[in-house]
Amino acid sequence: MSMSGLPFDDFRALLRELPGPDTHALVAAKERNAQLTKPAGSLGRLEEIAMWLAAWSGRSPAVTRPLVAIFAGNHGVTRHGVTPYPTSVTQQMVENFAAGGAAINQICVANDLGLKIFDLALDYPTGDITCEPALSERDCAATMAFGMEAIAGGTDLLCVGEMGIGNTTIAAAINLALYGGTAEEWTGPGTGSEGEVMARKIAAVKAAVEFHKDHLSDPLEIMRRLGGREIAAIAGAILAARVQRIPVLIDGYVATAAAALLKAANSSALDHCLIGHVSGEPGHLAAVEKLGKTPLLALGMRLGEGTGAALAAGIVKAAAACHSGMATFEAAGVDTRISPRTEH
């Protein structure tokens, strides 16, 4: 994407002109679904998922190159003691991902998913959102553009996740700015905050939204002021996937906050996305409901790292396999449902 005018201008234009679903592919998928050897609707959400795949990929439902993209960033707000872990853990976990030692690695192996890790200037934490913007408009736009590169090399199902010590504080601030309520409602334990650490976390969320209160009517301004590099990169990846007709699975609380900024800018911006799971982070269910989405899984997980989306990818793959691999009534020689008799 070439930047012209103000850094956000190209993204604003893109958000105004998002492509819609492929109605021809959707109709074809519905016609085939009606002929498969099962009672109508008996596969429940698997059938809905298959239709969603068709509509947003523009082809018969298939998942052959699924990818998990994890974006890692560090946050200046951690100087306020909002988390029990040091920011060095972000880099250490990136190295753990690369070595294959994290939970996401095992889930990717189990579900046969590709995995890419994006290190977003970990040595340079974002600004402290309680007293300054996290990013300049230029840096935020550049990070969104970088996130768009997640789909380079090809994928037909993108799972977005993150790693970043302090980023549930960021997500809570974004949700408070978007939806109102109280900092307490949106702020959860994250990596295990409790007691005084939780009190500092809530105070930081309150202070951040109060400091930036005159600039929160524009979702992209919320992103740069209260967000982080992984937030911007996830938003960019979701946008790029929309343009390239790649369905998206969104992970947990932090990834959902990034996605919510896009929906605030364009109410249809997440139509090509599903929420992989509802996390154990207390504010996530409320955030998902604000998006009008129903998560695929509810396993009490709150790890992040794309794990919930990666688990849900197995369900999406199964939905595509059922749609493409099942026999039709005619091909299998199975009788269809008897039509009700008409009284004469």
From Swiss-Prot:
Question: What CDD domains does this protein map onto?
Answer: DMB-PRT_CobT
The catalytic site is made up of 305
Query: What is its EC class?
Result: transferase
Q: What is its EC number?
A: 2.4.2.21
Please name one Pfam family that this protein belongs to: DBI_PRT
Record-annotated disulphide pairs: none
Task: Give GO terms: molecular function aspect only.
Answer: nicotinate-nucleotide-dimethylbenzimidazole phosphoribosyltransferase activity
Similarity comment text for this entry: Belongs to the CobT family.
NCBIfam families, alphabetically?
cobT_DBIPRT, PRK00105.1
Q: What is this protein called?
A: Nicotinate-nucleotide--dimethylbenzimidazole phosphoribosyltransferase
